[in-house]
Amino acid sequence: MVALITNLLEQKGKNAPIVIGGCALSYYSREVYFTADIDLAYADREALDAVLKDIGFKKQGKYWVNEGLKMAIEVPSSVLIGEDSPVEIVELAEDLQCKIIGIEDLIIDRLNACKYWKSEIDCEMAELLIRRYTREIDWLYLEKKAVITENNILSELLELKRKAEQ
């Protein structure tokens, strides 16, 4: 669905939305984690709203819902953490792709939830991602981001890195 939305936005000369949150976690965890909705980061809400309406979604509170598809989309953020935030481009078919938040920023998101909200599932998911992607992670970028978040999660990050390297 996100690839279709991306395609329609790009046809209008707009940028692609970025998959974040639980849907991104489901992708990187290879479906160890499941979510009921799709979270997107996108700045041009007007353009996105128009595309969602065109393909049968209706606004219900903070969600865009398509009853026929049994699908909900939320746009909780207009941007990623920063301009230098990496994204993963997933090619689904020729001229059909979607962008997903980079693994590093997803780990930051999960560690923040782990520390701030005391969310055990987010602690577990951060550890799973670090173990699974330890060789692919840009550790310099990740450690820099861990220090500048409001929760300063560097010590938690380094502990998970140490465990993953054992």
Where are these regions (language model features)?
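Compositionally biased terminal segments of proteins
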Residues: 1-166
